[in-house]
Each structure stands twice: as C-alpha cells, then as structure tokens.
Amino acid sequence: MAEFKFTDLVEPVAVDKKTALRITVLGGGSFGTAMANLAARNGCDTMIWIRDAETAEEINKTHINKRYLPDFTLESSLRAVSDLEQAVCDRDIILVAIPSHSFRDVLKQIAPYITAQAVVSLTKGVEAKTFSFMSDIIREELPEVPYGVLSGPNLAKEI
C-alpha cells in the first residue's frame, strides 16, 4: 500500500514568515499533531511542543510522528520543539492539546511566558479532582488571557 500524504488531498500554502500567523500546539498526541499539521498546511508558522526531545528531533528529521500518526507524512514547515519557553514565546495563538490530567500543570508552566497570545483548548473531558472544564482552568491559571475552546466529535486521522 502506498504511503498516504496530506498533500495528496490539499496543496499546502507557503509560509510567509513576515505575515504568517504564528501558532504553537502544545501536545504531540494524535489530535495535537493533526491540528499542528493542518495549521502548517494552511500557511501558518507552526510549532508543536513535545515533552520528549528525542521525539521532537525525530519528527523534525522524518516528518512523521511514529507513535501517534505513523501513517501520515507531516508538512516540512512544521517544527517540533521540546522547550516550552521556545514553544510559547512570540506566538499569536497557543492551541493546548494536553491530556486533562496534565492540563493545569502545563498552563502553570507557560504562564510566565504568556503575553498577548490567545489560548485555545483542544482537550476533551474535565479535570478529575475538581470536575472543572478546561475553559475554567484557563480562566483560573491565565486570567488575563483571551481564550477559546474547540470541541466536538473529532478524530485526528479525519482532520
């Protein structure tokens, strides 16, 4: 079976570093990877933050997230990083695709680096200890930051 590439469906838009929207996706799971790839394909200057430096390096070399989306070749303009400060600073939008059990902790870690960025939660579910929605956690941990939520029945391989 031939390898499937996103570009077989849609021709990617070239990234213009001067005018491109600067997006970071926090979380290298299947949904975070799919959303980061979609942003890159649509001409955004896109980074994906992955906790593991070796995995980030492998994605940058192979353009494949072998653990979560092994059958998809990612856009060459998508950059994976493992440094949270680098991932968040000087970005326009931060998409958070972190599991709900780690969501609050990651927001606390990025709080010192957030200035005018908008934060959008892609995370499903509620926080187990508090039963808080992810939007409530954003409001608590980043009270001055504009935020949004993307939700619905989405499968990463369909995006």
Report the location of each language-model feature.
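NAD(P)+-binding Rossmann beta1-loop-alpha1 motif at the extreme N-terminus of oxidoreductases
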Residues: A2-F72, V81-S82
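Rossmann-like NAD(P)(H) cofactor-binding subdomain of soluble oxidoreductases
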Residues: L74, V81-C89, I93-I159
